[in-house]
Amino acid sequence: MKADQSNSRHKQTNPLSNVSPYLKASKSIVTLGVSVCLAFALSACTKEASTDETQAATNNAPQTTQPAENIRIAAAANLSDVLPEIIEGYKADRNLPNQEIEVTFASSGKLYSQITSGAPYDVFLSANQSYPAQLAEEMFKGETNRTPFTYTQGQLSVYSATKPLKGLNQTTLTDLFKSDDKTKITIANPELAPYGESARAYLQSQDLYDSLTAQKRIIQAENIGQAFQYAHAGSVDYGFVAHSQVTAIKATPEQFYILPPESYPAILQDGMVITDVATAKDFADYLRSPEGQAYFSKAGYLAVK
């Protein structure tokens, strides 16, 4: 009997021995749960910190303005050297690296005809004042936001790739053209190209145009770009070209003679914003800004206010 009671007491003194594995398992589960929670918490903190760092980096990064609508420009041929540089300057100054600006270069008269026929240009940059004025009168009469503006003044030079011109003046240039009756001279079409119109006016003022025409010594180019090509390639002896073209190729002093501005009709170049595209107006404003005028002066034009 005592033995039975002793055994009974012994069994009662270890009642937890049978459930301790479960408690151990529960403890392990609790520990695992705490670990998982800690892991999630650390992950969330890391993610939040990473997000904050990314946001801070984004906020501190240079902001790029989104490009606006594409701009389509109809530009006089004499601008083919300077306008691409101005466009790059505009995009950089306005922080618009992805802005699309499409340019068509041709004679001002040809571009004028295209515009009046419905060509989809936003800006017209002529080599004279008359074409934009005609455009305003014919297509936008009474619209105050379609007023032509002067963006630069061109200069006329005589250029030769084969004949020395250093040290000439108006008198000696006239004598040169008269003395050598075999030389060929190119000018842009005076009916379409303002630089050609001014070249013809200069030759007329020197009593040369009629005689040169009669001798078939004047080779007429479609525009000022083609006139320069003829002279630069040596296809003709002399070319009346835009001084900006001479500047662009870094011609030597003996290759060109800058005609005095007062010796021919001033080549004031006007432009006009044709559409309501906001970026087109902004670009037109840039042309007249000190930054835009600096490009023109560097390229051989006369600055305008």
Placement of each model-derived feature along the sequence:
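Exported/periplasmic ABC-transporter solute-binding proteins
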Residues: 45-91, 95-96, 109, 116, ...
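A short beta-strand-loop structural module common to alpha/beta enzyme folds
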Residues: 98-108
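Intrinsically disordered, glycine/charged-rich N-terminal periplasmic/extracytoplasmic linker segments
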Residues: 113-118, 125-133, 142-145
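A common structural microfeature
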Residues: 120-121, 155
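Short, low-complexity disordered leader/linker segments with a strong preference
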Residues: 1-70, 300, 304-305
